[in-house]
Amino acid sequence: AREAGIEHFIFVTGRNKSVIEDHFDRMFELDTTLAARGKKAEQDILAQNQPEAGAVSFTRQQAPLGLGHAVWCARDIVGNEPFAVVLPDELVLNTPGCLKQMIETASSLGEKSNLIAVEAVPDHLTHQYGICGVGKRNGKMFEVDGMVEKPAKGTAPSNLSITGRYILQPEIFKILETQERGAGGEIQLT
C-alpha cells in the first residue's frame, strides 16, 4: 500500500483484535532500550517501518456482519474521497504491486470508477471464491456485470476470482447502508 502512495491507513477490527493496534503503535520502551544499548541501526529500522503520527486509524466492527459492513464502518474516517480496500488474508505479490497498478489505472480513467482486482482460478474451484461476471473487455480491464459470493458448483459466471483488492468511490457507503443481508446473513461487498 505504501508503494501505491497510500498515506492514511484505516484498520477495521473486531473484538479481541487490539494486538493489531499495538503492532502499529510506537514502541517507545523498545526504542529506549535500543538507545541505552547503543543499537542505532536497529533504531533506524524501527523508525523506517513506523507509520507517521496520525497516519493510522482504527475503527471497530461491533458484530461480524460481513465485508460490506466492515467497509461501511470506516465511512466517517474515509469521508468523501476514493479509497482502497486491502484484505489482509489475500497475499498478492506483483512488481509493481497490485494496488499501485490499480491506482494508476484509476488515475488514467479520469472518471469515478470502482476497480476490483481479479485472478483466474480453475473452473472446478470457483465455488470457493467471490466470482465476477464480466462484460466488455478493454485490455486487462473488464466491465463487471455481476458478482456472486461462492456460487454453487457449475454456476459461476466466469473463473475470475476477486482477490481482495478494491478501489472504491465514497458513494458505495450509501449503497452499503441499505444493502440487504446476503450469504450467511452478512452484508456483502461483492
Give residue ranges: language-model regions.
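N-terminal glycine-rich phosphate-binding loop and ensuing alpha1 helix
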Residues: 1-41, 61, 97-104
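Short loop/turn motifs at secondary-structure junctions
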Residues: 5-7, 79, 143
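A conserved hydrophobic position in a structured secondary element of the catalytic/binding core
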Residues: 15, 86, 94, 167-168
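General structural feature for long, well-ordered alpha-helical segments within catalytic domains
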Residues: 16-19, 70, 98, 102, ...
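Conserved beta-loop-beta/alpha segment of the NTase-like Rossmann-fold superfamily
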Residues: 30-32, 42, 46-134, 177
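Catalytic-core segments of class I nucleotidyltransferases/pyrophosphorylases
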Residues: 84, 107, 137-190
